[in-house]
């Protein structure tokens, strides 16, 4: 959430600013939370729906594209965890086409540790071919597993995308945090739950819907669609109730790992090659 911009344990986010600026790359931080009255989401993900944050990213792109100080063909995006989801989904053509001009795109995206199995990503992605993507995920990440993201990236590449898959042995979630990895018992995990994908027609996948209907949190697919459109927060709470009844929610995961200084040179090199060279 927004608090992370200033937290001591996330110096990586601030350490990137000066070297990027020295290259001629300005840094803009996109706060998806404060305007929605939220500081963080780890207690209640319904406070800021993940799809609304995809909208935010494209609104930011459109805003920057209208400013003559910036080269609109050389804008990149990066983030970890939910920010990783945003950085991955900005490569989806159908979202872009629904929100902004079809000639706008992020030149490069660098997602870290996104959640790809339980966030409604398209089962059949239609990537924006101009977006060069470098997906980095820790092989020791037990909060958001790398497997679903690897499969998603492979599908993106098969459909004309440009995604480099980079898995790091021993790295956990928040691997650029400047503290040793630690186990947090209160974190919830969802990788044992049925996967949630968005089909080509915009509907949720059958396996996901069947689980929700089985536990009577929605009466029908029609009701699921109606509540999701009219009251996303209420829909999220109903979905969470269904997952609890499915008994697939796990507890506890590792976070951290002082790998920011190791990762930073590669990170800066990616932006130089993608936006400057």
Can you say where each PLM-predicted feature lies in the sequence?
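Active-site glycine-rich loops that stabilize anionic/oxyanionic intermediates
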Residues: 1-7, 139
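Alpha/beta-hydrolase active-site loop
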Residues: 12, 45-68, 89
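Short beta-to-alpha linker loops that shape the active-site pocket of alpha/beta-hydrolase fold enzymes
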Residues: 32-38, 115, 171
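Short glycine-enriched nucleophile-adjacent loop
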Residues: 62-65, 84-99
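Alpha/beta-hydrolase fold nucleophile elbow
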Residues: 69-81
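The feature captures the conserved acid-bearing segment of alpha/beta-hydrolase catalytic domains
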Residues: 101-170
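C-terminal catalytic histidine-bearing segment of alpha/beta-hydrolase fold enzymes
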Residues: 162-277
